[in-house]
């Protein structure tokens, strides 16, 4: 899952009478089936939080960065688990461009008192150089036309243009390196967006250090900087999706069955064991595959764990992009599970890419009302694999706890922070919701259920900054 949650803020409690003005309801098949308690029990009695926990424990022994041996080990484990439940599991490979962070970033400036801490920009290139420091404003083409940066290191302030544009503008005028300084307090972390052989070595510094350098230059002090970046690398890597399919046990042979997806992502960020992000979602996906395997359905259910989610939803994008048109037309729902087990995260929310209700939110709210007495709140949020399905026109939603835990994307995202109770709750809500729609001879959808609260999650994930 990508970047940090902010707190939930209640907008309004939706009622049946106001639903038409505040939510966009999906096509008729998207209304929820109201189950008998005995139907829910068929799913609930099979769910075992201990099994989910054990799978998380195995997966979170080490980070599972996309394209690494540890990811491949996790993929093999997931495949074996699916097979142990009686599925034919397939591994789907895809290639992607990956960037390895440098292991050394150094900046020193002769003529400047004090130490400067420099950070790299993602996709910045390696280099070992020295040169005179010259100020080039915001790094616009116009400013660089008026500044002699040839053979020099350009000092550029953040703002207006992307980091990549600033670096390329400086490179075009012959600069050998770039020092970008923040326009606000604090360190500056950012990305150049993609690999480009025209990039030159570039680092970022704080606003305080940048303004201090600029003050020296304005006072007529000549500054010479030495800049070194080592270990950065861009190259093609391979990641994987794992797919297991439960065929419909009964359906009209004249037509193909509908398809429902239950998904999670098995990769993690570098340095983080990813127990919650997202070994939890992967393990609940595995458990629901086990639970639903022998229950009769007239709907096809596909269980997928995606790779390279942390690199930009690459696995799910690859998967959905390569689905046949007929499969997309038959797909009626994607239940995406990401970060669903942390004991110190907030409450469960259901997030759609556009913030509107759809089949998934309807089914899940009906399910959570039956199980917990209240419908799970919903809101708007992207930055997880449900987006790839939503962009293909498929009703999709993310199940996640918010606000997130303090150790999100850190080495402390470990198994001891996982709550079996939260795992059980999510598995029950999603499992019964899916079975409502998938079971044979499901009742005609009934929309007479209490509506959940709509919540706002502003800036749900702080994207890597480009400007």
Question: What label would you give each PLM region?
Answer:
Residues 1-29:
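Sec-dependent N-terminal signal peptides of Gram-positive bacterial secreted proteins and lipoproteins
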Residues 82, 170-171, 178, 242, ...:
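Alpha-helical metal-binding/catalytic segments enriched in His/Glu/Asp
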Residues 116-206:
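Extracellular/luminal Protease-associated
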Residues 121-141, 194-275, 290, 294, ...:
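Soluble metallo-hydrolase cores and metallopeptidase-like ectodomains found primarily
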Residues 297, 306-398, 402-404:
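Metal-dependent peptidase/peptidase-like ectodomains
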Residues 406-467:
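His/Asp/Glu-rich mid-to-C-terminal helical/loop segments that flank catalytic regions of hydrolases
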């Amino acid at each position: 899952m990508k970047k940090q949650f902010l707190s939930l803020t209640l907008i309004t409690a939706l009622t049946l009478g106001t639903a038409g003005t505040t939510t966009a309801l999906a096509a008729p098949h998207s209304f929820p089936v109201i189950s008998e308690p005995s139907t829910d029990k068929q799913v609930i009695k099979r769910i075992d939080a201990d099994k989910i926990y054990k799978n998380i424990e195995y997966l979170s022994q080490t980070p599972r960065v996309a394209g690494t041996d540890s990811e491949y080990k996790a993929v093999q484990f997931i495949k074996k688990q699916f097979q142990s439940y009686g599925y034919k599991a397939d591994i789907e490979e895809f290639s992607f461009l990956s960037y390895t962070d440098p292991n050394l970033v150094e900046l020193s400036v002769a003529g400047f008192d004090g130490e400067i801490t420099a950070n790299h920009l993602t996709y910045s290139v390696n280099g070992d150089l020295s040169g005179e420091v010259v100020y080039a404003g915001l790094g616009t083409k116009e400013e660089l036309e008026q500044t002699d940066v040839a053979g020099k290191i350009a000092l550029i302030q953040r703002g207006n243009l992307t980091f990549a544009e600033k670096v390329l503008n400086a490179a075009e005028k012959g600069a050998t390196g770039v020092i970008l300084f923040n326009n606000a307090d604090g360190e500056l972390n950012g990305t150049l967006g993609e690999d480009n052989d025209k990039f030159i070595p570039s680092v970022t510094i704080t606003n305080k250090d940048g303004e201090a350098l600029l003050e020296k230059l304005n006072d007529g002090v000549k500054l010479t900087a030495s800049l070194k970046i080592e270990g950065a690398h861009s190259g093609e890597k391979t990641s994987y999706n794992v797919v297991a399919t439960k065929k419909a046990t009964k359906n009209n042979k004249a037509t193909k069955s509908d398809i429902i997806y239950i998904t999670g992502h098995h990769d993690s960020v570098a340095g983080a064991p990813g127990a919650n992000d997202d070994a939890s979602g992967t393990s609940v996906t595995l458990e629901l595959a086990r639970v639903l395997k022998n229950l009769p359905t007239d709907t096809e259910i596909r269980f997928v764990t995606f790779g390279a989610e942390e690199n930009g939803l690459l696995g799910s994008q690859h998967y959905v992009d390569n689905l046949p048109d007929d499969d997309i037309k038959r797909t009626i729902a994607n239940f995406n599970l990401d970060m669903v087990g942390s004991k110190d995260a907030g409450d469960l929310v259901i997030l759609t890419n556009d913030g509107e209700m759809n089949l998934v939110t309807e089914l899940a709210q009906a399910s959570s009302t039956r199980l917990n007495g209240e419908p799970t709140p919903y809101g708007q949020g992207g930055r997880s694999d449900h987006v790839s399905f939503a962009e293909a026109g498929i009703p999709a939603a993310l199940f996640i706890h918010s606000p997130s835990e303090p150790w999100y994307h850190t080495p402390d995202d470990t198994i001891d922070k996982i709550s079996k109770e939260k795992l059980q709750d999510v598995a029950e809500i999603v499992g019964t919701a899916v079975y409502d729609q998938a079971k044979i001879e499901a009742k005609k959808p009934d929309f007479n259920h209490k509506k959940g609260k709509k919540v706002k999650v502003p800036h749900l994930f702080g994207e890597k900054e480009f400007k």
